[in-house]
């Protein structure tokens, strides 16, 4: 059986990218999408006006793909994912520590090597994407990745930036929170009296999952601009399971939140009018309710993207343990409830069969086989296409290692 170490030793030196660029700057606020060009002397950036067509120069094969739903069947699994030039989004998610980032990065490399200009984005606070590519991807900037045959860019988003945006959406004219929100209406003295509405908690504390949702919505805004329509494959390395599920419920949460503010408005409308008439005080700029409504609209757009069966697919990543499989089953059920399309399940870190007398290896593999049996018998997971990824002898870092992993998973 081939190992990563032998693959890397036999691989030719990493070739330089087949593209160059001079200007890639986005006007999106909160995240500066200007490219980083100081990584190395050979790193270059893609021009905004460059138009690329996808070239499918690979040899088409009819591949054997394992499915837990039925015996081995003949289909072209990766050909389905790589075909066409219409933009597609792939969200990879699952329990923390199962290898989501490595799988996402390997898919991005695979797409690029098959001619697709690709962007891989991490919204995971752990910032593991930098480790996977062995490049510094932090700072909210698009970074070109060298090696693939088509342009590949990577981006890590700082969730704290998203939290700051939520706080700014709930503040009046540069204020610091709910007190300024009320002061801006001339009603600061009513804050304590209206404490049962918990408005301060609402406006000053971002709800769980909002940071990732805002980050994804910003990337969508960025990709909708004409100068970036070259990307035909977008791969998201999402945060652990809980964040993803909370993200999908955010529009409903914000509906309730805005409802609280509107309820507050109704209670104090007459008092506001009286104070304005006496002191001549005028509202300046949009209020918190208006800002949060715009934010809610963006969250709805993110949820709609997750549910778009034509352009989006969520890929669950797990490992062969009882706990991980159980969480993956719950994730699959929750995604189905939210109408998110899920077709594939990656089981990562599988031990290969061994002819040695390693007792630990034998016991561990039997334990993993029991976990695979759980998947085959699970009502949620058994319908998904099973994709197996082995436990390799070296850490997956850098494009050559990601190419090795991608050739195994994404057949």
UniProtKB/Swiss-Prot annotation:
Compartments annotated for it: namely:
Plastid, Chloroplast stroma
Q: What is its EC number?
A: 3.6.-.-
Looking up InterPro entries in the UniProt record yields: Anion-transp_ATPase-like_dom, ATPase_ArsA/GET3, P-loop_NTPase
Q: Which GO terms describe its cellular component?
A: chloroplast stroma
Q: Which reaction does it catalyse?
A: ATP + H2O = ADP + phosphate + H(+)
GO molecular function annotations of the record: ATP binding; ATP hydrolysis activity
Give the EC class as a word: hydrolase
Keywords, ordered alphabetically: ATP-binding, Chloroplast, Hydrolase, Nucleotide-binding, Plastid, Transit peptide
Task: Report residues binding ATP.
Answer: 95-102, 348
Positions annotated as active site in the UniProt record:
124
By its UniProt entry, which Pfam families does this protein fall under?
Answer: ArsA_ATPase (PF02374)
Question: What is the transit peptide's residue range?
Answer: 1-67
Kindly give the CDD domains that the UniProt entry links to this protein: ArsA
Q: What happens when the gene is disrupted?
A: No visible phenotype under normal growth conditions.
Q: Which family does it belong to?
A: Belongs to the arsA ATPase family.
Which protein is depicted? ATPase GET3B
- Report the source organism: Arabidopsis thaliana (Mouse-ear cress)
What is the gene name? GET3B
């Amino acid at each position: 059986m081939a190992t990563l170490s032998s693959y890397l030793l036999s691989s030719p030196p990493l070739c330089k990218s087949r593209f160059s660029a001079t200007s890639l700057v986005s006007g999106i606020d909160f995240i500066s999408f200007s490219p980083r060009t100081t990584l190395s002397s050979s790193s270059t950036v893609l021009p905004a006006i460059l138009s690329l067509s996808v070239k499918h120069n690979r040899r088409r094969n009819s591949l054997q793909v394992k499915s837990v739903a039925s015996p081995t069947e003949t289909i072209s699994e990766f050909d389905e994912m790589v075909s066409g030039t219409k933009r597609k989004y792939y969200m990879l998610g699952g329990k923390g520590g199962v290898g989501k980032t490595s799988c996402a990065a390997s898919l991005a490399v695979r797409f690029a090597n098959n001619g697709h200009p690709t962007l891989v984005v991490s919204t995971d606070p752990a910032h593991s994407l930098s480790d996977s590519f062995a490049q510094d991807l932090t700072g909210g900037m698009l970074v070109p990745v060298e090696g693939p045959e088509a342009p590949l860019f990577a981006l890590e988003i700082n969730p704290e930036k998203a939290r700051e945006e939520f706080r700014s959406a709930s503040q009046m004219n540069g204020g610091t929170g709910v007190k300024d929100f009320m002061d801006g209406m001339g009603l600061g003295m009513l804050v304590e009296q209206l404490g049962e509405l918990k408005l301060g908690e609402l406006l000053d504390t971002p709800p769980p999952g909002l940071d990732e949702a805002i980050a994804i919505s910003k990337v969508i805004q960025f990709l909708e601009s004409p100068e970036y329509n070259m990307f035909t494959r977008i791969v998201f390395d999402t945060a652990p399971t809980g964040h993803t599920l909370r993200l999908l419920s955010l529009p409903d949460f914000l509906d309730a939140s805005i409802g609280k503010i509107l309820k507050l408005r109704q209670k104090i409308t007459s008092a506001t009018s009286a104070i304005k008439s006496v002191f001549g005080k005028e509202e300046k700029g949009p209020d918190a309710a208006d800002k949060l409504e715009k934010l809610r609209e963006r969250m709805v757009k993110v949820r709609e993207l997750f549910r778009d069966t034509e352009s989006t697919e969520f890929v669950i990543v797990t490992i062969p343990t009882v706990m991980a499989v159980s969480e993956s089953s719950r994730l699959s059920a929750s995604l189905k409830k939210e109408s998110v399309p899920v077709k594939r399940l990656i089981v990562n870190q599988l031990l290969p069969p061994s002819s040695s007398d390693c007792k630990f290896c034998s016991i561990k593999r039997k334990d993993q086989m029991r976990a695979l049996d759980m998947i085959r018998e699970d009502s949620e997971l058994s319908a998904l296409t099973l994709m197996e990824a082995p436990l390799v002898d070296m850490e997956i870092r850098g494009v050559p290692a990601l190419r090795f992993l991608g050739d195994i998973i994404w057949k």
